[in-house]
Amino acid sequence: MATANTSSGSMNGVGPVTMDSSTSGASREARIATHSHIKGLGLSDDGTALPSAQGFVGQKAAREACGLVLDLIRMKKFAGKALLLAGGPGTGKTALALAVSQELGHKVPFCPMVGSEVYSSEVKKTEVLMENFRRAIGLRVRETKEVYEGEITELTPTEAENPLSGYGKTIAHVVIALKTVKGTKQLRLDPSIYESIMKERISVGDVIYIEANTGAVKRVGRSDAYATEFDLEAEEYVPLPKGEVHKRKEVVQDVTLHDLDMANAKPQGGQDIMSVVGQLVKGRRTEVTDKLRGEINRVVDKYIEQGIAELVPGVLFIDEVHMLDMECFTYLNRALESTISPHVILATNRGQCMVRGTEYEGPASGTGIVAPHGIPLDLLDRCMIVRTMPYEKDEIREVLRLRAKVEGHLIAEDALEKLTEEGVSSSLRFALQLLSPSSILAKTAGRSEITIKDIVEANELFIDARRSAKVLMSIGEATTEAVPMETS
């Protein structure tokens, strides 16, 4: 659901944190992603955009517009509409969509996709779109369960003669004693629960809970009374549970409609060898039928009416939406009007261009329907369009300063100014990409701070798109002069 691939070190803007080799192997160096510094839209209490807040710099009008859309989403008045972010490359369209998802919270599903993802040789384009639509719709299920919870003080399996095999024995039942702060209770459980206990590797001293209805067993951790037993142990110690052993517990589960589709489309097989081999051999990607989705929708509606579940519309972000064709746009029109639909955010960097899938064949080949942003007008009418503007020089400087802080680089003021000039002359993305190579060059020279010399050297080693185009043009002219065209 939503997406949080970065650790807390990078999100707080303190740079990558390298753990000592003596610490746990689970600790890893924090990965700095492209939008690690974005934590929200950076709006004040009255909805106006701050100059620089929550990792966002500039784009005040676009941020304020997204703030209004955010209020509409929270009030559930954005159904049947879509938000279109239109602007040049590197103007913060993806960052705006990510900021909206973070403002909504991690419990609201956020499903990003690119327009070219719909083209597959195995699945229809409309099926890929519907899958992503269902991924962006969450279902919060509240269920009251009867559970037995406590620390295991006794675990005794009772064996009995197996009438089907000669001298073999089988588990008849298992006796478990659970202890809490209030008291102890002894349980006599089914042998199938003993199999679950063996799979979880549960032993005396572990804190577990058993669901009374389903018989599911979950290991919570090791009792903290055993914390002094071993000096080196990768174990999670938990306190002794309070209250009675047998209690009622409210469990909240967050799933998406796509999870329900997959669970019903691919049910788990049996324990026989053919079922196991069938699960190992991955087949072709299959489509979920409309009939199955309709049945799931009916069950979901029933749960919502009974108050068991709550529908959580998430955000579907389609980047490079101009890559979709006419069939996909027609399908989007219908999907936006359906009763169960997420909030859709589209992004494109195209102006007037041809709608994909409308090219004519024959004498007029290469021509088709030209529309703003490469989107048909009937879908464009449903969109609230937000324009992103190119960054000014001061804003580029602030973004570079912020990224240097997040990535843990020390940079001199004159070097930052030189990098800002590169961002103005080429692009902000190219200037950001020069940060890490410049840092490595500075460390190679024995400096902890990036200087203007490192920026110049990195700029000579790596060229931007405009310089690359000029080099290719000059090479092309030289080749044309050196090798004349042959004439018959």
Swiss-Prot record:
Protein localization: Nucleus
InterPro entries linked: AAA+_ATPase, P-loop_NTPase, RuvB-like, RuvB-like_C, RuvBL1/2_DNA/RNA_bd_dom, TIP49_P-loop
Recorded GO CC terms: Ino80 complex; NuA4 histone acetyltransferase complex; R2TP complex; Swr1 complex
Binding site for ATP: G87, G88, P89, G90, T91, G92, K93, T94
Enzyme Commission number(s): 3.6.4.12
Taxonomy, superkingdom: Eukaryota
Role played: DNA helicase which participates in several chromatin remodeling complexes, including the SWR1 and the INO80 complexes. The SWR1 complex mediates the ATP-dependent exchange of histone H2A for the H2A variant HZT1 leading to transcriptional regulation of selected genes by chromatin remodeling. The INO80 complex remodels chromatin by shifting nucleosomes and is involved in DNA repair. Also involved in pre-rRNA processing.
Family designation: Belongs to the RuvB family.
Protein name per its UniProtKB record: RuvB-like helicase 1
Native species: Mycosarcoma maydis
